């Protein structure tokens, strides 16, 4: 691509969006290069990038081009193509959703759009419920406010496969961003019926499905637990509070500054419940209210973070691995106790999620399926079970990045479901005088102590992308040890491994049942390492983890 030429073409043609026009005029040479050195990558996660002007940015033109490519793909595969569209609280999410709707309608693709911002699982749900050809969610999940994205779902409600993504990308690449995109006015589309708002009955059906995930099976528990909940200025407020209230959890307090949708995320620059800073304000509220449980969901409400009081009365954050283990053990224990465990029960987790989950699953007679990083691969396994007539065999799926799903009604992680099930689990144990931290220690005593950590390293721009590739190649060299722990085996998923799709992921199995996974993020300019350490106690595990981390970081210099 001739960067200067493309920049001048945008100056001449990208005149419909005032923000794009203004930004184009202010770009210096370095910013022009970063904005135009490539087209924004489209993959199984759809699009994700910084909001702004250029081919490597999220804007009305790149969104329209992607929508045109998706429309062309759908018309080839469906006689009467249709799509569900949802959007979150991010900057320009509603604008991008309406642009996409206009393009689909102009191409004869029937549009069903949520009338207000909604959590991402409702798009997966509505796609299945309304039997549409695809779903689109405008979101960048938990990224900083400068990002937005465009997530695509197949007719099964699962994020698109690698093959579908490649086909859609091929359609997108045929297009000129200005000459080949059919656009349509959103309001005109609504008026002529090409665009329809999704009725409230679909939202109610979603909430009912979440409520049906309860595994109390008639047991009475104390639902008067004091809860503080924050949607982190995202989409979770209405569906989470409605579900909790309808299930009897009425003693709930909101984090006022984080309740209302706000794409600038004024109280937490990184609205990710995995990050302590994002939970800080909620923890302040929890202390003031003397709450029993703090819950927070990310902006598109597919992840849940929690904090609970320890014996000293201080609030302690639980990791995604810890919460997932607790939920798995609780759900399985309840199903076994009440005779509700399905035939050939299955638990699905990602390869970077702690292996103790598999031990717990085995204890309860569940078969574990390990998949690549990304909840779409968990959703894909649910689909395979459904094709075999065994959808009910799916008991639980989770990933270390705070994503959980207890049923097959959607094919993506669900923060509404996660928040409700965590409340139910908490109240169940509280009724018996047991804290979640007590239960966690019990699991460690049964299965052994395990520490799991995630480290992220940013590499911005075109130079950063090249550096990440070089680092991955260095890791593929003859690595003997990490932090004094010898490499027992290297699992390289690039050529495909254990029947899994090809993926740029390395997993080093180390001695003493330790491991480290290295992979580039699929949605951000980051390299991630996942370290797992087994030891006799927390202190010993932390020492080993620090040394493994130091060794890994030598390759990042």
Listing of model-derived features with the role each one plays in the protein:
Residues 287, 291-293, 314-316, 334-519, ...:
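Phosphate-binding and adjacent anionic-ligand microenvironments
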Residues 36-56, 140-141, 227, 231-243, ...:
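Conserved phosphate/anionic-ligand binding catalytic regions in large, soluble enzymes, centered on
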Residues 95-104, 147-153, 302-321, 357-360:
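Short Gly/Thr/Asp-enriched flexible loops that form oxyanion-binding sites at enzyme active sites
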Residues 29-36, 40, 148-280, 284-286:
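Gly/Ser/Thr-enriched, mixed-charge loops and adjacent short helices
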Residues 115-178, 272-296, 325-331, 346-357, ...:
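Phosphate/diphosphate-binding loops
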Residues 2-100, 107, 188-190, 195-225, ...:
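An N-terminal, well-structured beta->alpha segment
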Residues 79, 84-147, 246, 250-305:
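N-terminal small/polar loop signature for handling phosphorylated ligands or for N-terminal nucleophile
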